[in-house]
Amino acid sequence: MTGNTNAGAPRTLYDKIFDAHVVERSDDGTCILYIDRHLVHEVTSPQAFEGLRMAGRKVRRPDQTIAVPDHNVPTTPDRVNGIENPEGRIQVAELDKNAREFGLNYYPMSDIRQGIVHIVGPEQGWTLPGMTVVCGDSHTATHGAFGALAHGIGTSEVEHVLATQTLIQKKSRNMKVEITGKLRPGVTAKDITLSVIGATGTAGGTGYVIEYCGEAIRDLSMEGRMTVCNMAIEGGARAGLIAPDEKTFEYVKGRPHAPKGAAWEAAQAWWKTLFSDEGAHWDKVVTIRGEDIAPVVTWGTSPEDVLPITGKVPAPEDFEGGKVEAARRSLDYMGLKPGTPLNEIRIDAVFIGSCTNGRIEDLRAAAGILKGHKLAPGVRGMVVPGSGLVRMQAEEEGLDNIFIDAGFEWRLAGCSMCLGMNPDQLAPGERCAATSNRNFEGRMGRGGRTHLMSPVMAAAAGIKGHLTDVRELLAETV
């Protein structure tokens, strides 16, 4: 769906995409928004499909609805029988039934293309610039890396989109996050997105759609851009966007569901208008110098609890207001003492994967650090590719052998340890260096302690047995 994106006053990228999809706008600003792509997984969709049945409705656009099981899916070879939780087993079975009954584009566990929905969508070419994309999952913002307006929705909204291919929504405000200059060696897209959250807080983006821009963002690959946008929700934003460019077009071109021939040329012509105009209004602007960003890790139980690896665990007294008690609770849960150097915190496990960092470039980066090394004694490691195709490509490149030789488990695709909904979990008190997106209490299993970081930082921690500055290992290889 397109629209006149050049008329009137200067507009942001978000303005252009939103305006092009408005079906109807009420006087109070409430809009009916057309949805181009609807992604569904097994956790937030069963009630929505049952609602359709009870109302005697069909899915309005099954051809634009993509279904993938990922949250409950075991990453061991015994896929279906490995689902120990009865509710999880039912959810996966219901998605299978619903996808087949309603004629959706479906990637079951037996399909090599199956994986985490936010990796499968772009991989298959379902995600395109200028689109509206929704899913009953908070990390739908990942797709914003393509210049698509993408965000999570609730189960009742899932039913509404299934039935009407529209969503009722008011427009958010515009926020610009500019990362100027170049990143230093050892600093990655994950460090960018965590540093932004550390600077603005988890409520800094509330009520906004963020556009990420600046030289450091432009320098990122598409996979790096997906990592940045993935965590827009952790910064409180409805969505995160990056304007499409030649890197975007090159990534999309030739994928199974990308336009072909004349349709490609027409689509690309529109995509090239998808940028924020000079003089467009921003309600909030945050600027960070790329050269000031260091490899970072989280120390507490919120993504905003982030510091450079060269720092020390803060004390509750370092904070103000309600954050004093929050810090005290975080330190108690994480079993940390104020003043402890972050690079002395010992770990029990390493998790490399998730919709944040489960793509081929993430695995290459981690393998580059691990090659010729072993996991430290007493540390277990798990590498979970984000899709079956990522896994296959990694094996073609020999990355699996590097991980296995280092002592990691090489798993099948799925959400895995990122959330405690499948067999891959931490034991109470276990501490994990993780490439996922949330470090909440119990996120990776009851009592589990999560430190968020980049794939290269997680790999370095695995080698040393404690949180480590990856730049030290990089210096050793020079």
UniProtKB/Swiss-Prot annotation:
Q: State the free-text cofactor note.
A: Binds 1 [4Fe-4S] cluster per subunit.
UniProt keyword list: 4Fe-4S, Amino-acid biosynthesis, Branched-chain amino acid biosynthesis, Iron, Iron-sulfur, Leucine biosynthesis, Lyase, Metal-binding
The signal sequence is none
- Give the Gene Ontology MF terms in alphabetical order: 3-isopropylmalate dehydratase activity; 4 iron, 4 sulfur cluster binding; metal ion binding
Q: Which reaction does it catalyse?
A: (2R,3S)-3-isopropylmalate = (2S)-2-isopropylmalate
Q: Which family does it belong to?
A: Belongs to the aconitase/IPM isomerase family. LeuC type 1 subfamily.
Tell me the function of this protein. Answer: Catalyzes the isomerization between 2-isopropylmalate and 3-isopropylmalate, via the formation of 2-isopropylmaleate.
Q: What binding partners and quaternary form does the record give?
A: Heterodimer of LeuC and LeuD.
Question: What's this protein's name?
Answer: 3-isopropylmalate dehydratase large subunit
